Amino acid sequence: MIEERDLVLSNGIHCIADIHSELYARLKKESQAATPWVYQKQYGKFVTYFVAVIIFLSLIKKLAFMYYDSSEEFLPEKKNSPTTPSVFLARIMTKLVAFNRYICYRKFPTLIFSYLGIPTSVGTFLVVMATTLYTLLYCFVPHPFYRPCAGFGSPPLSVRAGIMAISLVPFVFSLSGKINVIGWLVGLSYEKINIYHQWASILCLFFSWVHVIPFLRQARHEGGYERMHQRWKASDMWRSGVPPILFLNLLWLSSLPIARRHFYEIFLQLHWILAVGFYISLFYHVYPELNSHMYLVATIVVWFAQLFYRLAVKGYLRPGRSFMASTIANVSIVGEGCVELIVKDVEMAYSPGQHIFVRTIDKGIISNHPFSIFPSAKYPGGIKMLIRAQKGFSKRLYESNDDMKKILIDGPYGGIERDIRSFTNVYLICSGSGISTCLPFLQKYGPILHKTNLEVITLDWVVRHREDISWIRDEMCTLSNNLRQLFLDGKIVVRIYVCSDSTVPGIIKTFPQTIDTASDQSDLAKREKDTEFGQDDTESNSTFDKSNNEYKGLITIIPSKPDLNQVINDYQIGFRNCFICSGSDSLRYTVGNSVAGLQAKVFSNKNVEECYLHSESFGY
């Protein structure tokens, strides 16, 4: 019987047996007066205010850089503009920014932190930890955690933890979208802020359990398991709380790095189904307690607005196009484990560094994957994608024998917020298929170098095998043809590092205009091996016609794995420097730490004003 286990307070009142007594009612009223149940909803507002402040500060930073970039004299009409920031304010700003970047650009060991789902960027880590600390303090510092008896009201710890969890839901859903209002405000694309979506979800899950446990603990403390069973049967709130926390736990488990790594496509389909179940069950559970359902109303309004905007502007409902209009992509194998997709004509505007989501119209239509895009040299007006065969979608595409595929395009997304034209030096650092991100910057800004502040564009590309260079053969030939003088003047520098020592016929260090494939290819391979890369080879070769000699020395191929830290430190840093990197985790780790170290030059060298880093990753 429950009465056999009945908590007795110091004043002699029983928490269960005396529940209908006048003294019990008076003590309940005193407990509510001391810690009002209705006040607990303020803790949800405290969380919202904190996140709003972070977003506001990020917005200020974005607007400041937009103003700063627009005031630069990289266009004739901007010269001698009265809107140029004062020298004093500019110096203060550059020093503060450099100090911030000195800390925030640094990277933690990628393998360990990524495996644990912890942000690898120091800057992101600090924001996440600040938010975590703030919410933990607001949840656990206020007392009391419990009321003397459960009948006096819900445990204050449970109520405030629950309302804090609900207040995070709008941010969780908003940050999940490929188009989201928070990303637009802070100037980050969705793949950059996806880590905040993950950690907002983790905090939401944590506070959900903090909400649940005090109810269970107090019921057991007062009347044992029988009391818990009675509360379960009598309270609809208890029963309705199970589905949302179950959905939330399944969302967390399926989102763990190890689960995403091995079951990515299952995760993609399961994620939105569980999210819908979580939202509906949570709405039923909280309505209308403390008006907390209004957080969920805001969630659905923002989420649907983002979804509609994405479909209408980026996706399959674009005005002037038929619903889910498909396009044809040419498919070809361009090396071991690499597929080339070319769409000859695209009806969308895009910027360097952006990517699209591709969905093939076949049995794999439910799968869509992101790929960086760049202009195709072979088909002007077309776009090209390089896809490394790994698992799922990319592996099926690589193993298919199709020369053409019907695809659906969603995008473009991502890109860089800063105006590249305002920098003096641009350094493009990439490995493998990361060239898809970096090359379009050279393609776009190389031809207009003389119209901007840009003085030098440097591309350093690390590949495993020499044959990988053929991925962008046409594009590099076009660039070396059209921008030959810039190459010769050292205003465009291209270095390709080949980690292995394999040699494939038809790939040469200087990207000749024409190649006679009927020639003795083994002789060519031997000559390449014997040649000192980066130097002019004056020996004639029957493989190439006379025009080939024009391209000697324009592009340097180095047959070794580079020390990227040394490569970056050897750069002739200019006045305003932009570093763009894309590739492996180890590359981004090295580049991040190296560019963080370069911030010291902003303090020590008056001829260096800025070292900005933009990195791309497909870890989302």
Curated annotation (Swiss-Prot):
Gene3D superfamilies: Nucleotide-binding domain of ferredoxin-NADP reductase (FNR) module, Translation factors
Domain Ferric oxidoreductase, chain residue ranges per copy: 161-320
Bridged cysteine pairs (disulfide): none
Positions of NADP(+) binding: 411-414, 578-579
Stated induction or repression of this protein's expression: By transcription factor MAC1 upon copper deprivation.
Subcellular location: Cell membrane
Annotated keywords: Cell membrane, Copper, Copper transport, Electron transport, FAD, Flavoprotein, Heme, Ion transport, Iron, Iron transport, Membrane, Metal-binding, NADP, Oxidoreductase, Transmembrane, Transmembrane helix, Transport
Cofactor: FAD
Pfam family, one: FAD_binding_8
Annotated binding of heme 2, by residue: 211, 285
Superkingdom in the source lineage: Eukaryota
Residues annotated as binding heme 1: 197, 271
Family: Belongs to the ferric reductase (FRE) family.
Function statement: Cell surface metalloreductase. May be involved in copper homeostasis.
Descriptive protein name: Ferric/cupric reductase transmembrane component 7
Species in which this protein is naturally found: Saccharomyces cerevisiae (strain ATCC 204508 / S288c) (Baker's yeast)
